From Swiss-Prot:
E.C. no: 3.5.2.3
Keyword Zinc recorded: yes
HAMAP family the UniProt entry points to: PyrC_classII
Species of the source: Microcystis aeruginosa (strain NIES-843 / IAM M-2473)
Protein's name according to its UniProt entry: Dihydroorotase
Gene, per the UniProt record: pyrC
Amino acid sequence: MRRLTMTRPDDWHLHLRDGAAMKAVLPHTVRQFARAIIMPNLKPPVRSVADAASYRERILAAVPEGQQFEPLMTLYLTDNTSPEEIVAAKASQFVKAVKYYPAGATTNSDLGVTDLRRCDGVLAAMEQVDMPLLLHGEVTDGDIDVFDREKVFIEKHLIPLITRFPKLRVVFEHITTADAVKFVLSANNNVAATITPQHLLFSRNILFTGGIRPHFYCLPILKREDHRLALLQAATSGNPKFFLGTDSAPHSRYSKESSCGCAGCYSALHALELYAEAFESVDAIDQLEGFASFHGPDFYQLPRNTEQITLTKSPWRIPDELPFPESGLVPLRAGEEITWQLGE
């Protein structure tokens, strides 16, 4: 196949940042996606409906003229989030989910939850009003190997969570292991998962090919090849429990290429083309539309998009660097050739 026309997709996990950084990256997402679930881990984080409303207005003001884009807002769950805030979030109609970060697990997560059980009152309110919970599914215990954090999170926190709240809609975000795939498949239909392009395309070997490769470093970290293959099988299976979430995370070149570099891969520029390469690698390009355009809105109980986009088999070179405050932004696979191209 040299040409694929499909329904315009959505990104169900996106970091836009704020201010000048947001203005630099938002056009990339708007070009590819109609909607996106916007992560709340700003400084300070988006903790209230008022915070979300203000951030939403800043995003809409930065959308390029003549373009359409709908930001789907989230709240940052803390130990102090109240059930009343959840009710207000649901009533707002623009807050679509609440995000759980284990304290210290990733970028700007210092104010995250210290113990998920402390949030049972809030989770009960979320279950009652049908507000989805988005999970960064890793433990942060210092004695747990970084490559095992997702598996331990499932056993220690996730299984007990869905047992306590069986009607709570849960998105296990950016899954990275065969263990996570198995869990999602075994759970009820209120549990789904997003998968990033980097976790479909690369194993952890890429981090050390020819030296340290900081622009492939993200959290959860890339895993072994057998885990990558399990994710690819899940994404291309047609199962509606799995859908697109880039976790595109812009960091300046300086903040990535340092003695203590930030976690995050930037893929918003070319995410759909990256997913197309992954799906084509296992002869499943026909399953891309479901994964990218249908499964997400169906889970979130939103209408599917109606606009069409076209991908063409037309190789192009990913830029070495993109404009970004401070020191530029290096996209995933910078300088390499990619085989699919999204039409204008």
